[in-house]
Amino acid sequence: MADKTPGGSQKASSKTRSSDVHSSGSSDAHMDASGPSDSDMPSRTRPKSPRKHNYRNESARESLCDSPHQNLSRPLLENKLKAFSIGKMSTAKRTLSKKEQEELKKKEDEKAAAEIYEEFLAAFEGSDGNKVKTFVRGGVVNAAKEEHETDEKRGKIYKPSSRFADQKNPPNQSSNERPPSLLVIETKKPPLKKGEKEKKKSNLELFKEELKQIQEERDERHKTKGRLSRFEPPQSDSDGQRRSMDAPSRRNRSSVLDDYAPGSHDVGDPSTTNLYLGNINPQMNEEMLCQEFGRFGPLASVKIMWPRTDEERARERNCGFVAFMNRRDAERALKNLNGKMIMSFEMKLGWGKAVPIPPHPIYIPPSMMEHTLPPPPSGLPFNAQPRERLKNPNAPMLPPPKNKEDFEKTLSQAIVKVVIPTERNLLALIHRMIEFVVREGPMFEAMIMNREINNPMFRFLFENQTPAHVYYRWKLYSILQGDSPTKWRTEDFRMFKNGSFWRPPPLNPYLHGMSEEQETEAFVEEPSKKGALKEEQRDKLEEILRGLTPRKNDIGDAMVFCLNNAEAAEEIVDCITESLSILKTPLPKKIARLYLVSDVLYNSSAKVANASYYRKFFETKLCQIFSDLNATYRTIQGHLQSENFKQRVMTCFRAWEDWAIYPEPFLIKLQNIFLGLVNIIEEKETEDVPDDLDGAPIEEELDGAPLEDVDGIPIDATPIDDLDGVPIKSLDDDLDGVPLDATEDSKKNEPIFKVAPSKWEAVDESELEAQAVTTSKWELFDQHEESEEEENQNQEEESEDEEDTQSSKSEEHHLYSNPIKEEMTESKFSKYSEMSEEKRAKLREIELKVMKFQDELESGKRPKKPGQSFQEQVEHYRDKLLQREKEKELERERERDKKDKEKLESRSKDEKEKDECTPTRKERKRRHSTSPSPSRSSSGRRVKSPSPKSERSERSERSHKESSRSRSSHKDSPRDVSKKAKRSPSGSRTPKRSRRSRSRSPKKSGKKSRSQSRSPHRSHKKSKKNKH
C-alpha cells in the first residue's frame, strides 16, 4: 500500500507490482477453487474471519494492481460470479438474508471505488494512453497517442504535468523490464485507435494553419490602419517581420486575443488622434461635443455610444470617441479637458485606437474657418491684398495711388490669396473645365464663355475678382506647370511679369493643425480670471441658491461651497444679493438665503484663505439686501406671516450683535432700513462724503489741526456759553425741593460769569412781557379740550395719564434745557408738540382700525371685493379713514377761528370797560388818604379792584411762567418780584386771587385743575417768589 499516494517511493511500488503479477495466477486459481465451496456453505456455518481476510487480500490486490493484465482477469471473475449468482438465485433464492444483501452492496461499492481509484492513479501516470488529454490555446484536442508519439510532440502541444514528471521513468527501469503480458496487451489494442489518432493530428495541423492565417490578416490590417491615419505609403515588410520575430512564445499564446484588447487608455500608438471619453452626461449630444472639443482643432469624427440595454441606461452616463484631424490638437484637448466639469460631469479622457481620417473634417472651428475664407474686396486685380491688410484684416484701406508708378509698386508687393471653394458642385465644375481646357486649349474656353454667358454657374469665367476665378486661374496654371491634381507647390510665386505674388492654398490645412495665432484666439476664454468663478462653478452656485431650503444641512453645504471658493467672494456676494432682490421668491427660500449670509459672515473669521473678504464685500451690499427684504415684508398680506418673517430677520440682527461682526450703529442702520424707517435713496442723496474704506488715502486734516468752519459757524475767541451735555452752573443751583432763599442769596454773593456778559443775559422787560403775552394759556387749554373730546372713550384715562406725564416732563425739561433756544421757540414748540401728539394718537387709532379690518378680511368676517386684493382693499379703507379725519380737522379749524374771533371781541370790550372804570394813580392815593374809616376803603377796594387785580395776577403768573421756563435772567427775577409786591398790597393773597380769577373763567375744565393740583411744589415756589 505504499504507492497509494503520489508522493510515495517509486521502488516500493515497483516491488509490490511485480509480486502481484507473479502471484496473480495462483490467486485466481485459489479463487476458482474456493469460490463455490464457500458460497455453497450456509451462512450460519460459514466462517467469517477467513472470508473477511480473503476479501481484504483480494481488495488489496485489486487496489495495487493497475496493469492491463488485471483488466483481462476481471471479466473472467465477473462471468464466474455472474454464473454462480444465477445458479444460486435459481436454487437457493429464498435463503438470502439481509446481511448477505448488505455484503453484496458493500462489494459493489468497493468495486466502484476501486475503479475510481484506478482512474485517479492513471491520471498521474503517462503509461496509459487512453486517458491523456492535451490543451491547445483556442480549443481542446483529445489526441490518444502512444508513448513514442507523445514524446515526439511533447514540446509543441501544451500538456499539464506534475512536478514529479522527471521521476516518472527512472533510469534503472526501461520498457524491457516490464512484464511480457503488459506488452502483449498494448499490442492487442483495437485498430480504431489509429484512425482516431490520424484524425486528431489533422485537426491540429488545420488549427495551426488557421492561426497563421489570422496572424497574417492581423498584420495586414495594422499596416492599412497606419497608412490611412497618416496618409503615408504602405510600410515595408521588414517592419512586420521584425514584429513577428519578437517574443514568439508570447505571441503564440496571445495572438488570437490581441484584436479584442481594450484600447481606450492605450498610449502605445503615437499616431492615434482618437480620444476616448469615459464619462459623458446623458443629455449631451454630438453637436455639444463638437462645440466643446472643436475649440482645439478640426474634428475627423464624433461618436457617442448610446445605451442599448437597461443595464447601460441604469449607469446614467455615456461614453464616446472624438477623433481629431491632427495629433497635436488631440494632445492639447486631452491636456486641457481631462478632469474638467462639463454639464456637472467630470470628463475622463484617454487615448483610443486609431481611426481612418477623412480628407475633409466634419467640424471646423470658427477661428480656423475665418482663415480659410476669402479676403475682402480690395479693388486690385484678382482681389490682391496689400501685405499689411493681409496680416491685419481690420487695418484701414490705403488711399488709391496718384500715379501709375505708385500703383505698379503697390501691385507688385500685393499678394493674391487662393482659397478652395467650399461649394462642391462649383468645385467639380471648375475641375472639369480645367480638364477640357488643358486637353483642347484656350479655344475651348472661349467657346464655353460664348455659349454660357448667361449661365450663373459659369460666372467664374467672367468675374476676375471672385475667389472662384482666382482658384480656377491658379489651378489651371498649376496643372500646366506639371503639378499633380492632389499635390502642388505651396510657395509664393509670380504668375505675371511685374505682377502680384500668388499664394497657393495648403495641401490639407486640417492635417497641420491650428496655428499659434488661432490657438491663442481659441484660448482667450480658457484662463479663468483671478477672483472669478468658472462657468461650472457659477452654475453650481445658482443651482444651490435655487434649491436652498431652511434646513441645517443644505445651508451648511452652501456655506462650505462659498468658503471653498472664497477667492471669488465678490462675485458670490453679488449673486446672493441678486437672488435676494427677487420679490417673487418664496419666503422660505428668502429666509434660507439670509441664513446663508449669516453663516458665511460667522465663518468669515475662520482660518480659511480669503474668508475675510466676505465681511468686506457684504458690508457694501447689506443695505441693498435689507431694503429688498423690506420690500418683501411690505408685500406680505397675512399679518401672522409678516410677523413671522419679521421675527426671523430680527433674530439675525440679534445674532450679529452678539458676534460683533459689524459695529452697533451699522446694525441699527440696517435694522431701520428693514423696518422702513430709513430710505436708502434719501441717504445716498444726502451723503456727500464717500465711505472710508480700508486702504483709501487719509485726508490732510489730522488730529490737532485747527478746523476753520464747523456747521457754518466760525469759531471765535469768545467762549461758548452753552454746550450740549454740559450743565450750566446757574441751573445746577435751582433744583426741585430746595428753598429758593439760600440759593438766591448765594447767587448775589457769587460772580455769575467770569467773562464779558452776552446780549442774552439782560432781557428788557417790555420784550419779556411781549413774549409772555404771545402765548395764552387759555388757548392751550382749548386745544387740549377739543383733542380729548374727539379721542376714543376707551383711551381717555391713558391719554390723561400721558398728558400729565408730558406736562411734568415738559416742566423738568424747561428747567434744564437751553434758555437761549427756548425763549425764541417756546410758543411754536408748545403748539407743535401738542399737535404732533394729537396726530400720533389719531394715526394710532386709524392703524388699529385698519388692523382690525384686515383681520376680519382674512378671517372671512368681511366679504372680499371682486377685482381687489387684500392689500388694495386695506389701503382703500385706510384712505377713507384718513379722508374722514381731514374733514373733521377742517371743521375743528373753523370752530377754532370762530372762538378766537369771539374771544378777541370779548377782550376788546373788557379792555374798554376797564379803561373807563379804572381810576388814575393820583385818584387812588387821594381816596386812600381821605378815607376816614378803613372799612369804607376796604369795601371800596373790594368793589372796584377785581378787574385790574385779576388782570395783574394774570400778567404776574405769565411772567412767572416765563421766568421759570427761562432761567437765564435770574438777576431780574427778584427785581420783578419786588415790583409786583409793591403793586399788590398783600403778596400772600395774589396767588389765591389769581386762582379765583382762573375759576371764574367759563372755559375752565376739571381735567386741567386736576393736572394743576398734581404739581404743588410749583405753586409753592411762586408764592415764595412773590414774598421776595
Curated annotation (Swiss-Prot):
It comes from the Eukaryota. Residues 7-16, 169-178 have a biased composition (Polar residues). GO terms for molecular function: RNA binding. GO terms for cellular component: nucleus. Residues 273-354 form the RRM domain. It holds the Pfam family Surp. The modification Phosphoserine is found at S67, S202, S236, S484, S787, S799, S810, S945, S947. The modification N-acetylalanine is found at A2. The modification Phosphothreonine is found at T718, T930. Residues 55-64, 97-111, 144-155, 186-222, 239-249, 809-840, 873-921, 949-979 have a biased composition (Basic and acidic residues). Residues 533-678 form the CID domain. InterPro entries: CID_dom, ENTH_VHS, mRNA_splic_Cwf21_dom, Nucleotide-bd_a/b_plait_sf, RBD_domain_sf, RRM_dom, SR-CTD_assoc_factor, SR140_cwf21. Residues 785-805 have a biased composition (Acidic residues). Keywords: Acetylation, Coiled coil, Isopeptide bond, Nucleus, Phosphoprotein, RNA-binding, Ubl conjugation. GO terms for biological process: RNA processing. Residues 1-111, 141-272, 777-840, 854-1028 are annotated as: Disordered. The modification N6-acetyllysine is found at K759. It is found in: Nucleus. Interacts with ERBB4. Belongs to the splicing factor SR family. PANTHER family: RNA PROCESSING PROTEIN LD23810P (PTHR23140), U2 SNRNP-ASSOCIATED SURP MOTIF-CONTAINING PROTEIN (PTHR23140:SF0). This is U2 snRNP-associated SURP motif-containing protein.
